Regions:
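Hydrophobic alpha-helical scaffolding
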Residues: 11-14, 29, 76-80, 140-144, ...
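Cofactor-binding active-site loop characterized by glycine-rich and histidine/acidic residues
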Residues: 249-406
Length: 416
């Protein structure tokens, strides 16, 4: 057991005196003569092996050194955080408004309405930041890239030949799904195989070939050709195939005049000879004919897909361009109910609109207003808007509508 003499001899170094001892030791390090002789002798007698490099450093000096450095570090960190925040705002601007800059006008009739928000200079960013590394939080894939690489990536995704508009949707899960598909899965950069390219080329060739033949063989006759919108044929063909792969059993099409004859022959399989006979002056009506013009008539057929046959029908359509919309929706709902399709997945409605009529006909909005109701909902409709830039009211947008695009009213229903 330690004797009381030893205890008293070391009592001045107990923990209760630590603050006093540290202050005294700080003074000793600054100037040994500033402390009493007995304390100076005590500090001199300390084993220097316990002192780093044989010489201790004043804690006050260390604190002062870091204190002077702290504002610089804080300033640099704050600047980096602010820059990163500006980059996030730029990324979000591309996701929200990149479609305005997309190359959608091959004839260059209108200048794209490019907002300043798609320029990095709109934010607190400059040329010196282009080579700096920033975080690009792309859905589940978080990585660092230079600002220059981030901008080039966003331009490729959102400002190429396809525009994507989805940030008006209120459900975060849907927005995240789009971001993941476009950015993480790099959907816009998907490469087609040579077989797919050849197949699309053949479909385009069939569409253009029929259009040119009808134009030269029956000049001056109304036919509402597909010229300028030939890509509609491979698009519709792809939709039918993918609907079949997804388990759809029936597809109901509704469309107006533009490109209808081409769709009848090149997608739905109407015999060309039957179409040509309708152009001839000696065409005779039979009991199956209504006497209506050829570009009002419909047809139905079974089309083979990788998942089996899909029954596809194109309804008759009158001259009132969009009046077929609620007819198709009603037909689809009746078919779904008859099949017991409560998930609304076996019968798919596809409506093909003209650019002018889609924004001008009130029946479009009336049909949309019923889309989410319990009695008339069909689980969603695929809308295709055709604008070959030579149709009615397309020469000057200012004379056609009061919105930048014809589908602006779809945003009210959170449609993509």
């Amino acid at each position: 057991m330690t004797g009381m003499g030893e205890f008293w001899s070391t009592s001045h170094t107990t923990g209760g005196n630590s603050s006093y001892l540290e202050s005294l030791f700080e003074s000793y390090l600054d100037d040994p003569a500033s402390v009493p002789t007995d304390w100076r002798n005590y500090f001199d007698s300390l084993n220097n092996e316990s002192v780093s490099n044989g010489k201790d450093i004043s804690h006050a000096e260390v604190v002062k050194r870091f204190k002077n450095k702290s504002p610089i570090l804080q300033k640099n960190n704050l600047e980096l955080i602010n820059k990163q925040y500006e980059v996030f705002k730029l990324i979000d601007a591309y996701r929200q408004k990149g479609h305005f800059k997309a190359n959608l006008d091959p004839l260059k009739l209108e200048q794209p309405n490019v907002t300043d928000e798609l320029s990095y200079t709109f934010y607190d960013l400059d040329e010196n930041d282009l080579n700096k590394s920033f975080n690009f939080n792309s859905s589940k894939d978080s990585k660092n890239s230079s600002l220059q690489d981030i901008i080039e990536f966003l331009e490729t995704v959102y400002c190429s030949s396809v525009g994507y508009e989805f940030k008006h949707i209120s459900e975060k899960e849907i927005i995240d799904w789009f971001i993941e598909k476009l950015e993480r899965d790099k959907l816009p950069n998907s490469q087609l195989s040579n077989e797919e390219k050849i197949y699309i080329l053949k479909r385009l060739g069939s569409a253009e070939g029929l259009a040119k033949f009808l134009s030269s063989r029956y000049p001056g006759m109304k036919r509402f050709g597909i010229e300028g919108a030939e890509s509609l044929i491979p698009l519709v063909d792809s939709l039918i195939q993918n609907c079949g792969i997804s388990g759809a059993e029936q597809i109901c099409f509704g469309m107006a005049h533009r490109g209808r004859l081409n769709l009848l022959v090149n997608v739905l399989g109407k015999p060309p000879t039957e179409l040509f006979s309708e152009f001839e002056e000696d065409f005779e009506l039979t009991g199956d004919n209504t006497g209506d013009v050829k570009y009002h008539l419909g047809v139905s057929s079974n089309i083979l897909t990788p998942n089996g046959e899909v029954h596809v029908s194109l309804n008759n359509n009158p001259s009132h361009l969009e009046i077929v919309d609620p007819v198709i929706i009603g037909s689809v709902r009746a078919r779904q109910d008859r099949l017991g399709d409560t998930d609304r997945e076996k019968v798919v409605p596809i409506l093909i609109h003209g650019d002018a009529s889609f924004s001008g006909q009130g029946v479009v909005m009336e049909t949309l207003q019923m889309s989410q109701t319990r009695a008339y909902g069909v689980g969603g409709t695929i809308h295709i808007i055709v604008n070959n830039q030579i149709g009615f009211t397309t020469s000057n947008k200012s004379d056609a509508r009061s919105t930048p695009v014809s589908y602006t009213h779809l945003r009210a229903h959170e449609t993509t």
